[in-house]
């Protein structure tokens, strides 16, 4: 998935057999921003990529939450969704592309899933709503919200805002 000059690769894989020894759905979503995506190569003592950063773990969770309820009830095959940022322009946020890419990868697969979903970031500057604002626009924005949903409903909302009315918040979800 590419937006501006930011590119994210999303892949999915599922076990052929269900795990009978578990009582939950084993979904693993992993989001990673490789240093090379931003034009950096790890140097010095550490030459390899480190463990996931906090924002990568949080992005994995924000990507997992809207995907999980759309799998069939009782589905127990292990599913892995791997999302890698291949290129980042430093302007467009790759985390919302993770949800779009994961949805597209699941739709292209044979894994049973009741998608697709879309994921967008909503910002607001001077009472004007902006879809997928740039990093610079987010700095000016009094609202930063990530919304995932399909044509029937909103599946997940996560974000923060300065003081605003309930009507303004609901308007930003439309």
Q: What is the predicted function of each stretch?
A:
Residues 3-81, 85-92, 151, 158:
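Glycine-rich, flexible beta-strand/loop modules in the N-terminal catalytic cores of phosphate-handling
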Residues 8, 106, 114:
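Short, electropositive, low-hydrophobicity segments enriched in small/polar residues
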Residues 19, 98-103, 137-138:
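A glycine- and small-aliphatic-rich helix-loop capping segment at beta-alpha/alpha-beta transitions
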Residues 44-46, 97, 135-136:
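Short intrinsically disordered coil segments
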Residues 66, 97-109, 172:
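Stable alpha-helical structural segments in soluble proteins, enriched in small hydrophobic residues
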Residues 109-173:
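Mobile "lid/hinge" segments at catalytic clefts and subdomain interfaces of large enzymes
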């Amino acid at each position: 998935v590419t937006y501006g000059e930011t590119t994210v690769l999303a892949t999915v894989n599922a076990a052929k057999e269900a795990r009978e020894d578990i009582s939950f759905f084993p979904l693993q979503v992993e989001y990673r921003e490789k240093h090379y995506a931003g034009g950096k190569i790890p140097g010095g003592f550490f030459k390899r990529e480190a463990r996931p950063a906090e924002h990568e773990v949080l992005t994995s969770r924000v990507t997992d939450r809207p995907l999980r309820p759309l799998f069939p009830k009782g589905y127990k095959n292990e599913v892995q969704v791997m999302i890698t940022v291949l290129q980042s322009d430093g302007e467009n946020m790759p985390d919302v592309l993770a949800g779009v890419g994961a949805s597209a990868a699941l739709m292209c697969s044979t894994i049973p899933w009741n998608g697709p979903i879309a994921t967008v970031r909503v910002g607001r500057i001077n009472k004007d709503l902006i879809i997928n604002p740039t990093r610079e626009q987010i700095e000016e924005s009094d609202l930063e919200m990530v919304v995932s949903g399909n044509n029937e409903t909103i599946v997940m909302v996560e974000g923060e805002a300065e003081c605003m009315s309930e009507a303004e918040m609901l308007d930003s979800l439309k």
